[in-house]
UniProtKB/Swiss-Prot annotation, chain A:
GO terms (BP aspect): Mo-molybdopterin cofactor biosynthetic process; protein urmylation; tRNA wobble position uridine thiolation
Main location: cytoplasm
Primary role: Plays a central role in 2-thiolation of mcm(5)S(2)U at tRNA wobble positions of cytosolic tRNA(Lys), tRNA(Glu) and tRNA(Gln). Also essential during biosynthesis of the molybdenum cofactor. Acts by mediating the C-terminal thiocarboxylation of sulfur carriers URM1 and MOCS2A. Its N-terminus first activates URM1 and MOCS2A as acyl-adenylates (-COAMP), then the persulfide sulfur on the catalytic cysteine is transferred to URM1 and MOCS2A to form thiocarboxylation (-COSH) of their C-terminus.
Xref: InterPro entries: MOCS3/Uba4, Rhodanese-like_dom, Rhodanese-like_dom_sf, ThiF/MoeB/HesA, ThiF_NAD_FAD-bd, Ubiquitin-activating_enz
GO CC terms, sorted: cytoplasm; cytosol
Name this protein carries in UniProt: Adenylyltransferase and sulfurtransferase MOCS3
Subcellular location per the Swiss-Prot or TrEMBL entry: Cytoplasm, Cytosol
Annotated Pfam families: Rhodanese, ThiF
Gene Ontology molecular function: ATP binding; metal ion binding; molybdopterin-synthase adenylyltransferase activity; molybdopterin-synthase sulfurtransferase activity; nucleotidyltransferase activity; thiosulfate-cyanide sulfurtransferase activity; URM1 activating enzyme activity
Swiss-Prot record, chain B:
CDD domains: Ubl_MoaD
Gene3D superfamilies reported for this sequence: 3.10.20.30
Its biological purpose: Acts as a sulfur carrier required for molybdopterin biosynthesis. Component of the molybdopterin synthase complex that catalyzes the conversion of precursor Z into molybdopterin by mediating the incorporation of 2 sulfur atoms into precursor Z to generate a dithiolene group. In the complex, serves as sulfur donor by being thiocarboxylated (-COSH) at its C-terminus by MOCS3. After interaction with MOCS2B, the sulfur is then transferred to precursor Z to form molybdopterin.
Name under which the protein is recorded: Molybdopterin synthase sulfur carrier subunit
InterPro entries: Beta-grasp_dom_sf, MOCS2A, MOCS2A_euk, Mopterin_synth/thiamin_S_b, ThiS/MoaD-like
Stated family: Belongs to the MoaD family. MOCS2A subfamily.
Molecular-function annotations in GO: molybdopterin synthase activity; nucleotide binding
Pathway noted in the entry: Cofactor biosynthesis; molybdopterin biosynthesis
Glycyl adenylate: residues bearing it: G84
Length: 402, 84
């Protein structure tokens, strides 16, 4: 035997670079080699997508595809930690792929700078072994689920809002349910809160995204201890997590059941009654006669001696900024309080004829006007179109946009 | 009847305004009755009725399942989160 002979399980450069994870039981050389041969698709380059991409790139995944049509904005940066201030306005999918490549040049990155929909999802997904759902809306979650089932790809699904996170692996193994087995019909769109409205803390998406990356590494390494068939609930406020054992695959499931009715992607906006994004919808619930724009309200408040303005936003938003005359009565309180309580909170009496209603962007204020008209019929309630956001854009650019 | 802890996650917490509360249930019951009692006691949850999962002692409850509840049983009300 020559002194230069040896048996290599892994290249010298990979052994050096990944030594600390090669040393971990049950991952080791075979896990590393499998990870290098795995192509992972991340849908959504936001608060979840950033840690998923960053950790998988660093760990040496073979190919990382990133789907996102959106651009980086300043209010993303508190949680989407892969992006820098000078990247605001740039493509998220490109920015995240660049970041991964900078950290580990050995990873192949594929940028899908598109809005994922029924027409392109099959074509994009078919080249990947594992998909991560890091999206922010219900319609896209059903689309991703269905396409993963149709192409038989395991799905690592994370989600987060406020202080809470959820994590599961769908469609991985014969008994494992898919998202549709658990939620055959979509939620009522009015009951869905997204991060733009409800907010979310960076470390919550950071925790869930990091755990998604870990699930991908376990699937790639062919470990049997994944979250398939289980749902992890993370409560960051209490520092607690619980793992729920889920149902088995539903034989009657519309997509992964024994006789599926869905055999190709469907129209998910129609199915969910909501768009495939987390942007705020502009509702028109009221007649123009019960609405004023911000310019009209500015004239009204400068002409009147005392103006009644009801602010429907939750206390955390009221605290960010409000007009001095605003009285905080939330939309929920408009719903639950009796007429007398509402009158006394507002400080109105039998002489009061006009009350204006304002919220963040002009949707809840319309809902509130409808509720208030029922309870206090003698008062003329009108909402301010576009809310404080419009006020900040058109009347007072010092007013905080959030 | 037996007093059992009910936990509210995510949007269920937002709607009910409490993280947990003790609720009386018949000791022998089933999935349908659990749902009915919870929705009657917390009508605000009707908003998420279509997507509301129940888990009894950390195990997903299926329609038709029967339960024998005990003092330390925990029932979780879990709607999906969709943000990210």
């Amino acid at each position: 035997m020559e002194s230069k002979d040896w048996v290599a399980g892994i290249s010298k450069s990979d052994a050096g670079r990944y030594s600390r994870q090669l040393l971990v039981d049950d991952f080791g050389v075979s896990g590393q080699k499998n990870l290098k041969n795995t192509a992972v698709l991340i849908v959504g380059a936001g608060g979840l997508g950033c840690p998923v991409a960053t950790y998988l790139g660093a760990a040496g995944v073979g190919t990382l595809g990133i789907v996102d049509y959106d651009r980086i904005s300043l209010d993303n940066l508190h949680r989407q930690v892969a992006y820098k201030e000078d990247q605001v306005g740039q493509s998220k999918s490109q920015g995240l792929a660049d970041n991964v490549k900078l950290q580990n040049s050995g990873v192949t990155t594929v940028v899908h700078n598109v809005s994922l929909d029924s027409s392109n999802a099959m074509e994009i997904f078919k080249n990947y072994d594992i998909v991560c759902d890091c999206t922010d809306n219900v319609a896209t979650r059903y689309l991703i689920n269905d396409v993963c089932v149709l192409l038989n790809i395991p799905l690592v699904s994370g989600s987060a809002l406020r202080w809470d996170g959820q994590l599961s692996v769908y469609h991985y193994g014969p008994d494992c349910p898919c998202y549709r087995c658990l939620f055959p019909s979509p939620p009522d769109p009015s009951s869905v809160t997204n991060c733009n409205e409800g907010g979310v803390l960076g470390p919550i998406v950071g925790t869930i995204g990091s755990m998604q990356a870990l699930e991908v590494m376990k699937i790639a390494a062919k470990l049997s201890t994944t979250l398939a068939g289980k749902l992890l609930l993370f409560d960051g406020r209490e520092g607690k997590s619980r793992t729920i054992r889920l149902r088995k695959r539903d034989p009657k499931c519309a997509v992964c059941g024994d006789e599926p009715s869905i055999t190709a992607p469907i129209d998910y906006m129609l199915f969910c009654g909501a768009g495939a994004h987390d942007k705020i919808e502009n509702l028109k619930l009221l007649e123009p006669s019960v609405r004023v724009n911000v310019h009209e309200y500015q004239e009204i408040r400068s002409a009147a001696r005392k103006q009644f303005l009801l602010d429907t936003r939750p206390p955390v938003e009221f605290e960010i900024a409000h007009l001095p005359e605003a009285i905080d009565i939330t939309l929920n309180e408009c719903r639950s309080l009796q007429a007398e309580e509402l009158s006394s909170r507002l400080g109105v009496d039998s002489q009061t004829s006009d009350v204006y209603v304002i919220c963040h962007r002009g949707n809840d204020s319309q809902r509130a006007v409808k509720l208030l008209k029922e309870k206090l019929g003698s008062i003329h309630f009108r909402d301010i179109i576009g809310g404080y956001e419009e006020w900040a854009l058109k009347i007072n650019d010092e007013f905080p946009l959030y | 009847m037996v007093s059992v802890k009910v936990l509210f996650f995510g949007e269920a917490f937002q709607l009910v305004g409490k993280r947990e509360e003790t609720v009386e249930f018949p000791a022998e019951t089933d999935y349908e009755e659990l749902r009915r009692i919870i929705l009657e006691k917390y009508p605000a949850l009707s908003k998420i009725e279509k997507v509301m999962m129940l888990a009894v002692d950390q195990e997903y409850a299926n329609p038709g399942d029967r339960f024998e509840l005990e003092r330390f049983t925990e029932i979780a009300v879990i709607p999906p989160l969709s943000g990210g």
